[in-house]
């Protein structure tokens, strides 16, 4: 018989740098999960993506065990890295703060494809372009 699920926790954690301090500690502690076990497993799984912010979905079971799924980094993080900017524009319709090429958008869309609600690469590219537009990043051909 399958284990009974008692909770699901969604966090965004820097790859390879999970530690028991907030926000991870309190989120896992209230579900009774062994925090250090999660931190060690997460850091081992994300060691190759050092420094990126990785969304993680942790499923907690009745016996206090857990499993977790790591997702791809958020599109906004990948776009900021491609445009070499620190943060998005405060007024994206007026101030364009960076530029990315269509090739960069396609590369990000390919990377994000498993997590996007898109059936083909063209639809995924349009989703990434929308994110770029809302951040004040201009797309050049």
From Swiss-Prot:
GO terms for cellular component: cytosolic large ribosomal subunit. Gene3D superfamilies: Ribosomal protein L11, C-terminal domain (1.10.10.250), Ribosomal protein L11/L12, N-terminal domain (3.30.1550.10). InterPro entries: Ribosomal_uL11, Ribosomal_uL11_bac-typ, Ribosomal_uL11_C, Ribosomal_uL11_C_sf, Ribosomal_uL11_N, Ribosomal_uL11_N_sf. GO terms for biological process: translation. One or more lysine residues are methylated. GO terms for molecular function: large ribosomal subunit rRNA binding; structural constituent of ribosome. It comes from the Bacteria. Keywords: Methylation, Ribonucleoprotein, Ribosomal protein, RNA-binding, rRNA-binding. Part of the ribosomal stalk of the 50S ribosomal subunit. Interacts with L10 and the large rRNA to form the base of the stalk. L10 forms an elongated spine to which L12 dimers bind in a sequential fashion forming a multimeric L10(L12)X complex. Belongs to the universal ribosomal protein uL11 family. Forms part of the ribosomal stalk which helps the ribosome interact with GTP-bound translation factors. This is Large ribosomal subunit protein uL11. The gene is rplK.
């Amino acid at each position: 018989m399958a284990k009974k699920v008692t909770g699901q926790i969604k966090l965004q954690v820097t790859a390879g740098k999970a530690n028991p301090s907030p926000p991870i500690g309190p989120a896992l502690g209230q579900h009774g999960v062994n925090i250090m076990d999660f931190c060690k497993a997460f850091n081992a799984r994300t060691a190759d993506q050092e420094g990126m912010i990785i969304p993680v979905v942790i499923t907690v079971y009745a016996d206090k065990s857990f499993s977790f799924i790591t997702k791809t980094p958020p599109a906004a993080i990948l776009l900021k890295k491609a445009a070499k900017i620190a943060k998005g524009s405060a007024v994206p319709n007026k101030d364009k703060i960076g530029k990315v090429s269509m090739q960069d958008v396609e590369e990000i869309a390919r990377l994000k494809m498993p997590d996007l609600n898109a059936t083909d690469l063209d639809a995924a590219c349009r989703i990434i372009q929308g994110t770029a537009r809302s951040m004040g990043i201009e797309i050049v051909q």
